[in-house]
């Protein structure tokens, strides 16, 4: 393998939607940073068998619905 071309691999904290924090190795962020998830396997419809829910982060879903409300979707 070539040296000095791969990203640093370190331990980060991952905060699940229920507040649980787990440690895992990742190339994301820096050592000790915390990654907060909007959706995780405990609430994702693909894993729970439930219906999907829309996350309106930043108002993008609302903006889309308002823009195309006259088309009858």
From Swiss-Prot:
Any one of the GO BP annotations: translation
Among the entry's GO cellular component annotations, what is one? ribosome
What the entry lists under Pfam families is as follows: Ribosomal_L31
Q: Does the keyword Mitochondrion apply?
A: no
- Key word Membrane present in the record? no
Q: Which GO terms describe its molecular function?
A: rRNA binding; structural constituent of ribosome
- Which keywords fit this entry according to its UniProt record? Ribonucleoprotein, Ribosomal protein, RNA-binding, rRNA-binding
Alphabetical list of NCBIfam families matching this protein = L31, PRK00528.1
* Assembly with partners or alone: Part of the 50S ribosomal subunit.
Described purpose of this protein according to its UniProt entry: Binds the 23S rRNA.
User: Which family, according to the similarity comment?
Assistant: Belongs to the bacterial ribosomal protein bL31 family. Type A subfamily.
The molecule here is called Large ribosomal subunit protein bL31
What is the species listed in this Swiss-Prot or TrEMBL entry? Dinoroseobacter shibae (strain DSM 16493 / NCIMB 14021 / DFL 12)
């Amino acid at each position: 393998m070539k040296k000095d071309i791969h990203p640093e691999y370190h331990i980060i904290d991952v905060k699940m939607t229920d507040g649980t924090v787990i440690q895992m190795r990742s190339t994301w962020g820096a050592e000790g940073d915390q990654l907060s998830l909007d959706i995780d396997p405990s609430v994702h419809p693909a894993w729970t068998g439930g219906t999907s829910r829309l996350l309106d982060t930043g108002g993008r879903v609302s903006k889309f619905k308002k823009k195309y409300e006259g088309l009858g979707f």
